[in-house]
From Swiss-Prot:
UniProt-listed NCBIfam families: PRK04306.1
Protein's gene: rpl21e
Annotated region (Disordered), positions in chain: 1-27
Compositionally biased region (Basic residues): 1-24
UniProt keyword annotation of Thylakoid present: no
InterPro entries to which the protein is assigned, alphabetical: Ribosomal_eL21, Ribosomal_eL21_arc, Ribosomal_eL21_CS, Ribosomal_eL21_sf, Translation_prot_SH3-like_sf
GO biological process: translation
Keywords: Ribonucleoprotein, Ribosomal protein
GO cellular component: cytosolic large ribosomal subunit
Subunit and partners: Part of the 50S ribosomal subunit.
Tree of life domain: Archaea
UniProt-recorded Gene Ontology molecular function terms: structural constituent of ribosome
Descriptive protein name: Large ribosomal subunit protein eL21
Amino acid sequence: MVKKAHSFRRKTRGKLSKHPRRRGLPPLTRFLQEFEVGQKVHIVIEPSYHKGMPDPRFHGRTGTVVGKRGDAYIVQITDGGKVKTFFIHPVHLRPQKG
């Protein structure tokens, strides 16, 4: 029997893959995004940049910006009945519209 892998990126072939035309790093404006405290943001993982990447199970979730630490933003998400706090690089965040 082979041991089961429990790595960070397991079972993410579809979630963390890019189409060939979208390969490489995103534009610099995505790295330099600014968010306000209290602003709602969506977690959309950028697979080509690994720093400040949240766990893939939170891809697509919406949270609230609570503060900033270094280049990363402190984002709170409700998971079930629990409030969880993440330090996420802005390249993995998109502002909520509307």
